Amino acid sequence: MSDRPAARRWGKCGPLCTRESIMVAFKGVWTQTFWKAVTAEFLAMLIFVLLSLGSTINWGGAEKPLPVDMVLISLCFGLSIATMVQCFGHISGGHINPAVTVAMVCTRRISIAKSVFYIAAQCLGAIIGAGILYLVTPPSVVGGLGVTTVHGNLSAGHGLLVELIITFQLVFTIFASCDSKRTDVTGSIALAIGISVAIGHLFAINYTGASMNPARSFGPAVIMGNWENHWIYWVGPIIGAVLAGGLYEYVFCPDVELKRRFKEAFSKAAQQTKGSYMEVEDNRSQVETDDLILKPGVVHVIDIDRGEEKKGKDPSGEVLSSV
């Protein structure tokens, strides 16, 4: 009998609560600025995949293949991503990588709803970029179109570990380079990210093809229909990215103010459990932190609790995330 009133209350509150939760989750999505950012992620990934995969084409063909030029490939990938971050960083944040986007979600710099659109745009851009390269490349030299594969002498577990490590160093570089609390960063953030990508390729091309980017592997895999060990290029980079983002954000360089608020919240919760149980309603609007947007000489800082922005506020009230 006692469950019926509760069921009635839930019947009235449930749909409303669900609608409110959905509206909060999709806050800022239906804005022109956000869709410009999604389009930028799509275009940046398309150009990146087209240019970088082009460096993997062996123009000697299958009969007389030329030696693989690891330096050429590494520089092309690194400089391509640096250029795209420089071009689109102020529009979308320049993720250009689903693993980076997931790391931003885990560190509360972008909402889950927005990340879904970002990742979809990245994957679509990668497919179209790989498709364009396939169309303009002679069939006799197209080869594997840069599809990432694990070396024959390596197990899937070893390949997974390699992808985890190289993505970890990339994402850690991103978080360290874009840390607004640092005053010693004077060089180009885009170039630092590009160098990190190049280093990952120099190390891991012979191991796994050095993906570090699930969309980069997804695009050519769709065009060529080659899905061998493809899961490695999603699981490895995403785990490495989440570990890097979490360790940097919450262990190595935590925000002092955020840490203080967490302590206050936990202490209040502990005090409430000691007395009578109370249901507390928080009327403050929940605003997620959409991280820093790269601009030359300008750093954007957002207050995590209050959603206050010191510079460059988006018309929707939020700031798009960035690397």
From Swiss-Prot:
Residues modified as Phosphothreonine: T289
Lipid-bearing positions (S-palmitoyl cysteine): C13, C17
Residue numbers of Phosphoserine PTMs: S111, S180, S276, S285, S321
Glycosylation, residue list: N153, N206
Tissue: Detected in brain and lung.
Catalysis: reaction(s): H2O(in) = H2O(out)
Membrane spanning residue stretches: 37-57, 70-89, 116-136, 156-176, 185-205, 232-252
Topology, Extracellular side: 58-69, 137-155, 206-208, 223-231
Subcellular location: Cell membrane; Basolateral cell membrane; Endosome membrane; Cell membrane, Sarcolemma
Chain location of the short sequence motif NPA 1 per the record: 97-99
Membrane topology: Multi-pass membrane protein
Motif range (NPA 2): 213-215
Broad class of the protein's primary localization: membrane
InterPro entries according to UniProt: Aquaporin-like, Aquaporin_transptr, MIP, MIP_CS
Keyword annotations of the record: Cell membrane, Cell projection, Endosome, Glycoprotein, Lipoprotein, Membrane, Palmitate, Phosphoprotein, Repeat, Transmembrane, Transmembrane helix, Transport
GO cellular component terms, semicolon-separated: astrocyte end-foot; basolateral plasma membrane; endosome membrane; extracellular region; plasma membrane; sarcolemma
Superkingdom per UniProt: Eukaryota
GO MF term set: water channel activity
A GO BP annotation: intracellular water homeostasis
Modification after translation, per record: Phosphorylation by PKC at Ser-180 reduces conductance by 50%. Phosphorylation by PKG at Ser-111 in response to glutamate increases conductance by 40%. Isoform 2: Palmitoylated on its N-terminal region. Isoform 1: Not palmitoylated.
Intramembrane feature ranges: 94-101, 209-222
Entry text on domains: Aquaporins contain two tandem repeats each containing three membrane-spanning domains and a pore-forming loop with the signature motif Asn-Pro-Ala (NPA).
Family affiliation: Belongs to the MIP/aquaporin (TC 1.A.8) family.
Role played: Forms a water-specific channel. Plays an important role in brain water homeostasis and in glymphatic solute transport. Required for a normal rate of water exchange across the blood brain interface. Required for normal levels of cerebrospinal fluid influx into the brain cortex and parenchyma along paravascular spaces that surround penetrating arteries, and for normal drainage of interstitial fluid along paravenous drainage pathways. Thereby, it is required for normal clearance of solutes from the brain interstitial fluid, including soluble beta-amyloid peptides derived from APP.
Subunit structure: Homotetramer. The tetramers can form oligomeric arrays in membranes. The size of the oligomers differs between tissues and is smaller in skeletal muscle than in brain. Interaction between AQP4 oligomeric arrays in close-by cells can contribute to cell-cell adhesion. Part of a complex containing MLC1, TRPV4, HEPACAM and ATP1B1.
Stated name of the protein: Aquaporin-4
